[in-house]
């Protein structure tokens, strides 16, 4: 096996520019594939197409329509004041008129119910069109609100501080309708953004509105991840650089592993983009962090072995060939075991777990290929130097002999 890797090492040294240009070409192809990445944070994206939960949900939608709501919880000292009721009505109307998938509104200012009177039955609104300003009129509205059990403690809290504004949504279109490539916004996220835009208006501040519902939570999740991901990746890169500086004490030993990690991530995500594989934003960081950890480990092994051989021989190209020969199989074995372990995620019947399995295992194998090709190719550049006579005479360094013992 080592002889086979030695031949690969000689090929890399002879065609180092081919290796580097090939890596750059694959990296460019990966970057291009990123434009086709499909981010889908819908809860339905967690299930496989034949999952019983998803099938039952589709049956429900076929009968009742969309099961998602855009909801707002208001929180004020007293809901039953003229000013607050007017704001709730205005908020309800704006949500119904402005949101793309609005269907039916339910709020304290929109509910009608039947009451008995001398003439039989009549249908009245809890909050009349002309909201009274006097205490008696407002007290009557409060009495009516708590008269019906399906309103009391469900739509309005006992103390009158909180109330729900619920907007039922029309069915969201299929992915083939809204997805037009990079920049396409899923209907869930669009609904969440529209709701956020409405409740953040200054005029609704007295209500202290809080957005609720899966579409709103999905959009907030995307915003949070978009804000935190650069921070986490920046911290990961910084820590990687610190570790590499201490481990390699070389510019190439720092730059190449970082490029390896970024390259494997871009290539694997680009491949998933070409395949139009749906990606959950909450899972995107896992393959990235793993790729950095694996890239640092593999490249430190390769670089450290090369440095010892280079000090022993003084011949840069010979040191590269020996490095690929001796380190190719151990690193490959490590990569294959990690690859096989990560593929076990495919046995879990959840789409995000499949993404983790495919993305992480692909990143590991790409990291291996880059570590045993690009790193040696980069290390082969430079001048030879006089071998270290002490290491040459001893046949290796102090640590080498200790490890062999």
Segments predicted by a language model, with ranges:
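Interfacial segments of transmembrane alpha-helices in multi-pass membrane proteins
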Residues: 226-279, 347-351
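Interfacial helix-loop-helix hairpins and adjacent transmembrane helices
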Residues: 1-23, 321, 369-405
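Membrane-water interface of transmembrane alpha-helices in multipass transporters/channels
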Residues: 44-48, 250-260, 275-291, 345-363
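Solvent-exposed, non-transmembrane loop/terminal regulatory segments of multi-pass membrane proteins
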Residues: 34-79, 85-86, 135, 139-156, ...
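Extracytoplasmic
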Residues: 58, 62, 86, 132-251
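Helix-loop junctions and hydrophobic alpha-helical segments within the transmembrane domains
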Residues: 309-336
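Transmembrane helices with small-residue packing motifs
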Residues: 19-20, 24-52, 74, 347-352, ...
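Transmembrane alpha-helices and their membrane-interface boundaries in multi-pass membrane transporters
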Residues: 274, 295-304, 328-347, 352-394
